[in-house]
């Protein structure tokens, strides 16, 4: 047959049209079925060349083969040592589980709308704690001796008494009955009980009153006995009372005063007691110890007992000590051989509020007490009732609150301090209150060690010698105890600011030196501290108080802002609140004002950041956001690159959260820890880790050394006792530990108090 020239073209794929079917043999029927399904699946979804082979957990497996997870590639991509992949693996290994969030994104908005300001001009309020202007109310007219009144005028520059001083002197100089002094903070309450006390003792020892010996000398001297005891809750307050008392006694040099407080050497205190004292200022724990163990302390002539800050004495758990002190004073009291000394003891209780614990303390110590208040005739019944239950703020104090998201807390505080100290002479001194000691240490390092990090990061290899010189200069300017340093974060060349820190975990001599340095400082300065500096301390020239962390109770808030606007001077206070349930705390703030809180103003984080980082230029709307973000990112890099500061930030973060949960029961709904965004809060401590991965085991860095020192001292005392020596220096328990134990016991009784973070 001839060829007809017909060509047939068939297009076939790469795979065979007919694939021979493999027949599986061996094994169980389940294994054969699984293998058959896998083969059918591969036939339907053929694998392209160069594609990774999918792994399956089914089918027969070779027991000698190591199984690899399906997420891991079959072969790693080979790159250079300096490639991107190698660098990313190194970064992930060095800093795992870090997330850099934006500073201005996903921040909660305030729940309460901003109130419109009133159109009527607000007149400046008259100071409520200022000295009286009336010329008739002088110290001489109230019963003080001319010598003491002249000393107040010439040496202390006090021309007229305050309202509470007038009321207390009118009562305590004439009668010997017990008294309860209630006055707002900053009204001169210390002099209200010290002036009558000193005047009564001076009257007894005055030569004109025939209280002299054959040589015409006063019969009252340091060996005459102890006449008065003043108890205060904290060591700092005892130191301040002692300083005021010493200044008063310069006009009566024959009257000797002294102090016994925790943290000092008992041997030196016993030596002072043996020499003789007429007025003693003490803390309850140390006085109870001396009454029990020191025979040189003779209290048979004590005729005046003052309990200053009575509410704080009860909150710290000193109820048992106070009961023991009062019982020992009653049991050891004897008739005095000195003419003019009262026959019975007068007890004076001082407190800013009349709470239940103060009433309980009054039942223990007072008998038929007289209630002393400033200007009771100028107040109606409703105002009196409100003052008894709540707290009062000085009328001249300008207070404001800022609604700041958790992310923006630290950068907003920095912006506010930048704006405050932008011009020289605007603000002299400021106090920043935080909740715990770890937070004090962290913020002190943030505000004072920034320059050191910048110098080291920029010129680490080229200018090491210059960096060492700068660091040595910085260290030379700082204090030897590490509590004073230049505030580089918010200082400027025209207005340098010094930074101080203070908390209860510092040794006593360091706390005293830091307080004295801050009080005597003539340059602009800032004190970052806990509530240890909130009670009774009269720090001069404090123009601004910032509550970075809200107080644990409304009473503590009153004492915090009471560090400014004292004795009629002007002052400002700012409290940071987060959006949400904390906004309800504004109603608590308004209760402290006589006008219902009309003078209370509101601001936002955006306004503070614009003024602090953006200046007064309105055209650059985004410049302040970029500057704030750069400052925050630089701070986070500083924390990541320095393990010491990173650990400090983590400790501060955890301690802050624990302290946040210790608000009193009546205010706990406003500070609900369940509504706290832990991730956003971590950013305010320069942390990039997830909250669940922030773990800092162990004690604070200083606690371990303190425990070692205490154990070594205890072992030394034990060896002395075995050898038959005296144990005058033996201290049964550490003051800080015992105070914390007493406070925890008190919390278990009431279940509505602040924890040890109030002490820190």
UniProtKB/Swiss-Prot annotation:
Q: Name one GO biological process term.
A: endonucleolytic cleavage in ITS1 upstream of 5.8S rRNA from tricistronic rRNA transcript (SSU-rRNA, 5.8S rRNA, LSU-rRNA)
TM region positions: none
Q: Where is the composition biased (Polar residues)?
A: 58-72, 99-110, 731-740
Q: Write out the biased-composition intervals (Acidic residues).
A: 456-470
> Gene3D superfamilies attached here?
P-loop containing nucleotide triphosphate hydrolases
- Uppermost EC category: hydrolase
Q: Q motif: where is this motif?
A: 137-166
InterPro entries attached here?
DEAD/DEAH_box_helicase_dom (IPR011545), Helicase_ATP-bd (IPR014001), Helicase_C-like (IPR001650), P-loop_NTPase (IPR027417), SPB4-like_CTE (IPR025313)
Where do the annotations place ATP binding?
183-190
Q: Cite the GO molecular-function annotations of the record.
A: ATP binding; ATP hydrolysis activity; RNA binding; RNA helicase activity
Q: Where is the composition biased (Basic and acidic residues)?
A: 23-34, 77-94, 701-716
Where are the annotated segments for Disordered?
23-129, 453-490, 692-760
Q: Name one GO cellular component term.
A: nucleolus
| Reaction catalyzed | ATP + H2O = ADP + phosphate + H(+)
Keywords linked to the UniProt accession:
ATP-binding, Helicase, Hydrolase, Nucleotide-binding, Nucleus, Ribosome biogenesis, RNA-binding, rRNA processing
PANTHER family tied to this protein? RNA HELICASE
Similarity field: Belongs to the DEAD box helicase family. DDX31/DBP7 subfamily.
UniProt miscellaneous comment: Present with 1460 molecules/cell in log phase SD medium.
Domain description from the entry?
The Q motif is unique to and characteristic of the DEAD box family of RNA helicases and controls ATP binding and hydrolysis.
Q: Please give the name of this protein.
A: ATP-dependent RNA helicase dbp7
Q: Per the UniProt entry, what species is this protein from, by scientific name? A: Aspergillus oryzae (strain ATCC 42149 / RIB 40) (Yellow koji mold)
């Amino acid at each position: 047959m001839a060829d007809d020239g017909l060509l047939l073209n068939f297009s076939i794929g790469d795979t065979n049209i007919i694939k021979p079917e493999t027949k599986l043999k061996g094994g169980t029927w389940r294994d054969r079925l699984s293998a058959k399904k896998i083969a059918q699946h591969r036939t339907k979804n053929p694998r392209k060349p160069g594609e990774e082979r999918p792994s399956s957990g089914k089918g027969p497996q070779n027991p000698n083969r190591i199984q690899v997870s399906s997420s891991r590639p079959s072969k790693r991509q080979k790159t250079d040592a300096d490639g991107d992949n190698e660098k990313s693996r190194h970064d992930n290994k060095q800093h795992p589980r870090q997330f850099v969030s934006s500073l201005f994104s996903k921040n909660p908005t305030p729940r309460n709308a901003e109130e419109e300001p009133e159109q009527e001009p607000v007149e400046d309020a008259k100071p409520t704690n200022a000295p009286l202007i009336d010329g008739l109310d002088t110290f001489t007219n109230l019963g003080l001796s001319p010598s003491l009144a002249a000393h107040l005028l010439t040496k202390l520059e006090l021309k007229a008494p305050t309202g509470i001083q007038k009321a207390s002197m009118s009562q305590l100089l004439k009668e010997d009955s017990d008294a309860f002094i209630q006055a707002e903070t900053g009204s001169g309450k210390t002099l209200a009980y010290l002036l009558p006390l000193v005047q009564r003792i001076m009257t007894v020892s005055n030569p004109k009153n025939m209280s002299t010996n054959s040589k015409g000398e006063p019969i009252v001297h340091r060996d005459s006995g102890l006449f008065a005891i003043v108890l205060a809750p904290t060591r700092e307050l005892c130191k301040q009372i002692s300083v005021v008392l010493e200044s008063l006694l310069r006009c009566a040099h024959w009257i000797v005063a002294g102090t016994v407080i925790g943290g000092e050497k008992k041997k030196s205190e016993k030596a002072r007691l043996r020499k003789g004292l007429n007025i003693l200022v003490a803390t309850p724990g140390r006085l109870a110890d001396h009454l029990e163990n020191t025979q040189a302390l003779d209290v048979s002539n004590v005729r005046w007992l003052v309990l200053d800050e009575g509410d704080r004495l009860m909150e710290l758990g000193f109820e048992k000590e106070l009961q023991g002190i009062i019982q020992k004073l009653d049991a050891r009291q004897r008739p005095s051989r000195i003419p003019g000394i009262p026959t019975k003891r007068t007890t004076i209780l001082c407190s800013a509020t009349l709470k239940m614990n103060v009433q309980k303390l009054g039942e223990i110590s007072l008998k038929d007490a007289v209630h002393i208040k400033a200007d009771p005739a100028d107040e109606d019944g409703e105002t009196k009732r409100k003052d008894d239950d709540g707290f009062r703020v000085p009328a001249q104090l300008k207070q404001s609150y800022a609604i700041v998201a958790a992310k923006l807390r630290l950068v907003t505080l920095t912006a506010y301090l930048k704006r405050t100290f932008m011009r020289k002479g605007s603000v002299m001194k400021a106090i920043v209150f935080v909740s715990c000691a770890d937070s004090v240490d962290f913020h002190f390092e943030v505000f004072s060690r920034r320059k050191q990090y910048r110098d080291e990061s920029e010129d680490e290899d080229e200018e090491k010698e210059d960096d060492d010189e700068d660091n040595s200069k910085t260290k030379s300017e700082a204090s030897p105890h590490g509590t004073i340093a230049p505030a580089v974060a918010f200082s400027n060349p025209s207005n340098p600011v010094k930074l101080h820190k203070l908390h209860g975990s510092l040794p006593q001599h360091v706390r005293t030196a830091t307080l004295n340095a801050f009080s005597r400082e003539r340059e602009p300065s800032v004190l970052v501290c806990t509530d240890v500096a909130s009670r009774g301390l009269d720090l001069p020239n404090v123009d601004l108080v910032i509550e970075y962390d809200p107080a644990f109770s409304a009473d503590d808030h009153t004492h915090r802002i009471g560090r400014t606007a004292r004795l009629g001077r002007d002052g400002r206070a700012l409290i940071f609140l987060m959006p949400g349930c904390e906004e309800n705390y504004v109603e608590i703030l308004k209760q402290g004002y006589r006008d219902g809180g009309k003078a209370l103003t509101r601001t936002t984080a955006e306004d503070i950041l614009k003024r602090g980082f953006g200046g007064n230029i309105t055209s650059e709307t985004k410049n302040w956001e970029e500057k704030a973000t750069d400052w925050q990112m630089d701070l986070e890099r500083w924390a990541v690159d320095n393990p010491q500061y990173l650990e400090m930030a983590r400790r501060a973060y955890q301690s802050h959260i624990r302290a946040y949960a210790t608000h009193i029961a009546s205010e706990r709904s406003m500070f609900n820890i369940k509504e706290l965004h832990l991730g956003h809060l971590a950013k305010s401590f320069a942390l990039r880790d997830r909250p669940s991965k922030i773990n800092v085991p162990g004690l604070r860095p200083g606690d371990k050394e303190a425990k070692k020192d205490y154990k070594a001292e205890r072992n030394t005392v034990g060896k002395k006792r075995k050898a038959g020596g005296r144990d005058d220096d033996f201290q049964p328990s550490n003051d800080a530990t015992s105070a914390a134990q007493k406070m925890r016991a008190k919390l278990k009784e009431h279940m509505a108090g602040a924890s040890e973070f109030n002490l820190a």
